[in-house]
Swiss-Prot record:
Signal peptide: none annotated. This is Ubiquinone biosynthesis protein COQ4 homolog, mitochondrial. The lineage of its organism: Eukaryota, Metazoa, Chordata, Craniata, Vertebrata. Lyase that catalyzes the C1-decarboxylation of 4-hydroxy-3-methoxy-5-(all-trans-decaprenyl)benzoic acid into 2-methoxy-6-(all-trans-decaprenyl)phenol during ubiquinone biosynthesis. It is a peripheral membrane protein. It comes from Bos taurus (Bovine). Its cofactor is Zn(2+). Pathway: Cofactor biosynthesis; ubiquinone biosynthesis. Keywords: Lyase, Membrane, Metal-binding, Mitochondrion, Mitochondrion inner membrane, Phosphoprotein, Transit peptide, Ubiquinone biosynthesis, Zinc. GO terms for cellular component: extrinsic component of mitochondrial inner membrane; mitochondrial inner membrane; mitochondrion.
Length: 265
C-alpha cells in the first residue's frame, strides 16, 4: 500500500510551484523518448489528476492567492474546456496564428523600453501602467505541468500570460475585489472550472460593503462584458501595443467599469 501511494503521489513531490524555464523558450514538443510533451511536463495518471485536483481545490479555496494551487486546479480539471478554447482559436485567423507561432509573454520577450515610449492612452502604456502600479511581473505566471497534450498546454499557458492584460482592459486592480471581477469575466469567457470556482467562492472573504457592490454592480457588468466580447484568446496582444486602449475595448465590446474598486476589500 505504501508503495502504491508513493507512486500515486509522486507528481505532488515533483511539483514545487516554482518558476519553470524562461517564457522565451518555445512551447513545443520535447519528447525524444522521455515521455515529456513540453518543457516542465509532468505525466500523470487519472488517479493522480483526481488527487491533484482535490488537493489544489481545497488549498485554492482556502487561500485564493495560492496561484500555484489555482494553476494546478486549472490544469487537472479543464481538459474538455481547453479543447473547446483550442478549437475556437483554430477557427479564428488571429487565434490560429497565435497557436502556430506560440508567442510567450515575459520580461525576456517584452520590449519594456518600447512600451514606455508609447503615447498615453495606448494599450501598451495601459498594460505597463498596470504592471508598475500593482507591482506585478509577467514572469510570475506558473509554467504548465499537468496537461497531457502539448497544444492544450499552450492554450492554458497563454490564458495565464494574458491575465494581466485583461486586468488592464477591464480597468481592474489586483486587490481581492478586482481579481474576483476578472475571474467572473474569465469564467464567462472560458468556462474553465477553476475560473468558475474562483468566481463563486472568492467573495467569501469580502467585506459586506464590497460584497454588496460586487453582487449589485460588478458581477452583472463582468458577465455582460464576458458574454459580449469575442474570445479573448484570439487577440494577438503583442501586436496591439500601439492601438488606443479605448479602441481595443470598443473592438472587444468591453465597457468602462461601473465604479472604481481601488481601496475596496
Amino acid at each position: 500500500m505504501a508503495t502504491l501511494l508513493r507512486g500515486v503521489l509522486r507528481p505532488l513531490y515533483a511539483f514545487r510551484g516554482g518558476p519553470g524555464p524562461p517564457a522565451g523558450v518555445p512551447f513545443r514538443a520535447v519528447s525524444h523518448g522521455t515521455g515529456l510533451l513540453y518543457p516542465e511536463h509532468i505525466p500523470t495518471s487519472v488517479l493522480q489528476k483526481v488527487l491533484l485536483a482535490a488537493g489544489s481545490a481545497g488549498m485554492a479555496l482556502y487561500d485564493p492567492y495560492r496561484h500555484d494551487m489555482v494553476a494546478v486546479l486549472g490544469e487537472t480539471t479543464g481538459r474538455r474546456t481547453l479543447k473547446v478554447l483550442r478549437d475556437q482559436m483554430k477557427r479564428d485567423p488571429e487565434g490560429a496564428q497565435i497557436l502556430q507561432e506560440r508567442p510567450r509573454i515575459s520580461l525576456s520577450t517584452l520590449d519594456m523600453g518600447k512600451l514606455r515610449s508609447l503615447p498615453e492612452g495606448s494599450f501598451g502604456r495601459a498594460y505597463l501602467h498596470f504592471l508598475d502600479v500593482n507591482r506585478v511581473s509577467p514572469d510570475t505566471r506558473a509554467p504548465t505541468r499537468f496537461v497531457d497534450d502539448e497544444e492544450l498546454a499552450y492554450v492554458i499557458q497563454r490564458y495565464r500570460e494574458i491575465h494581466d492584460m485583461l486586468h488592464a482592459l477591464l480597468g481592474m486592480p489586483t486587490n481581492i475585489l478586482g481579481e474576483i471581477v476578472v475571474k467572473w469575466f474569465e469564467a464567462v469567457q472560458t468556462g474553465l472550472p477553476m475560473c468558475v470556482l474562483s468566481a463563486l467562492f472568492g467573495p467569501i472573504r469580502l467585506s459586506a460593503q464590497s460584497l454588496q457592490l460586487l453582487i449589485s454592480e460588478l458581477i452583472p457588468w463582468a458577465v455582460e462584458n464576458g458574454r459580449r466580447a469575442p474570445c479573448v484568446l484570439n487577440v494577438y496582444y503583442e501586436r496591439r501595443w500601439e492601438q488606443p486602449l479605448q479602441a481595443l475595448r470598443q473592438e472587444l465590446g468591453i465597457t468602462e467599469p461601473p465604479l472604481r474598486v481601488e481601496g475596496l476589500v
